[in-house]
Amino acid sequence: MKFFNLKDTVITISGNPTVISLISNIEFYHGKKYTLPNRIKLNRLHDLSKRRSVTSSNEIEGVKVNRKIEDALFNDNVDPETDEEKMLIGYNNALEHIFKVYTYQELDDKFIRYLSELEWKLINPYFGGEYKDHQNYIREYLPDNTSRTVFIPTKPDETRQTLDNLIWQFNDCLSDYRVNRLVLIFVFIMDFLCIHPFNDGNGRVSRLLTTFLLLKLGYELDRYYSTSYLVLKRIGEYYDNLEKSSKGWHQDKSDYSFFVIYMLSIVLDGYKKLDYILSVNERKEPLKQKIMRIIGDANYAISKGDVEEILFSNKRDSIEEVLGKLIKEGKIKLLQKGKYSLYYKNI
């Protein structure tokens, strides 16, 4: 049986110089004040973040649908048909529930099981929310459609008691001023992943819990910029650091710092990107100038989707029109045509 000492673990990791630096930078962005756009425009940014969380978290687990079907599901409210489509909508429902209840919902066993239940409800209403009844494995899904085992989690007959103890210790830590809450969140998530309490869908539930705990403890990043999207973009690092931190976990000899530092860097990256998005939209300048600024600031070829994400308050047609004019004027280069168009500054 695994025994936790969450408080001491968090306090020890919080003294790591890299952790201290990351937290300091996160708090800098977390404390910044912005002139936020009106509610309608801000809702667009929230909807984009939510959709990206849904698609990214599922893609990490090998669940994907094409863009046309995705648009139909999210924009036209078309009923899901395949298991993949139902998985996306189930995750979306769980995420919407989190945004509704996080201010008053406490972290407990019932809530965690309910997130799993929502995740699976459209596929098999009797599957989600039930603790595992057979040994499961943490697997990394590779681009060639194969997978590899990263870690062997807690045994089924030890799962309930182990998770209950983890939840109790997490809530107990909240009252101790010495415990850094960001570090606490990611130590908890690391332990949750090592327990892997459900037969399937644990990775998705861990990302739902990440969103919930960040919101609950005052970090509203995921409301406007998806951490799951950033994890997907750095998925190799995710599994590498999870594997490093899980070594010796069953014997209480694991080093959580690898995973915690990785997740803190994800949060910092998200805050930086959100800061850039809001600062660009604060500027009182023509759309053409904003697009030139975005492409000029990028040190890489930037996609039309990236430009649309930053200029969330502008219509797609308007952005496409300006991009076309800038190409004709020779101010930017079109490096790739079609669905995945890429643009770069013309030096």
Question: Would you name each region that the model predicts?
Answer:
Residues M1-I347:
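FIC/Doc superfamily catalytic core
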